[in-house]
Amino acid sequence: MRSRLWLGLAWLLLARAPGAPGGYPHLEGDVRWRRLFSSTHFFLRVDLGGRVQGTRWRHGQDSIVEIRSVRVGTVVIKAVYSGFYVAMNRRGRLYGSRVYSVDCRFRERIEENGYNTYASRRWRHRGRPMFLALDSQGIPRQGRRTRRHQLSTHFLPVLVSS
């Protein structure tokens, strides 16, 4: 009798009515075209060779990225011009990937100062998240040397103007 009660309770908690939305569907599948402007004054770009770096040129086609929400708080960043996904390997190095993989997923968080940070969903270094970051010369910083409070990890998603 007791096991049937628990089974019924579990079914009530886990089951959804047919057609009922699950989670936050308005936040999933959202697609935004933006330029990611770093607080170090560089736009994130992915060139035709798949190299991730920063550029100061605000009108470059290779700095337009598509930020797609795949889950609540999880995004995929894809360069529109080159078609490469921004990805991070286990050593914390940023690279452009032709195909989508779990290395391409980032946790997007809006910080208190209004900037966004992007931490790898897959990789951590000694229990700490590894962040997307551009240093003061526009060179990607190794993820294991980054922290949330560092300015090099802060990005503003800027609207793409015609």
Swiss-Prot record:
Keyword Glycoprotein set for record: no
Keyword Transmembrane: no
Family matches, as SMART domains: FGF (SM00442)
Principal place of residence: secreted
Transmembrane stretches, start-end: none
Organism: Mus musculus (Mouse)
Organismal lineage: Eukaryota, Metazoa, Chordata, Craniata, Vertebrata
Subcellular compartments: Secreted
Entry protein name: Fibroblast growth factor 22
Tissue note: Preferentially expressed in skin; low expression in brain. Expressed in the inner root sheath of the hair follicle.
GO BP field: regulation of synapse maturation; trans-synaptic signaling
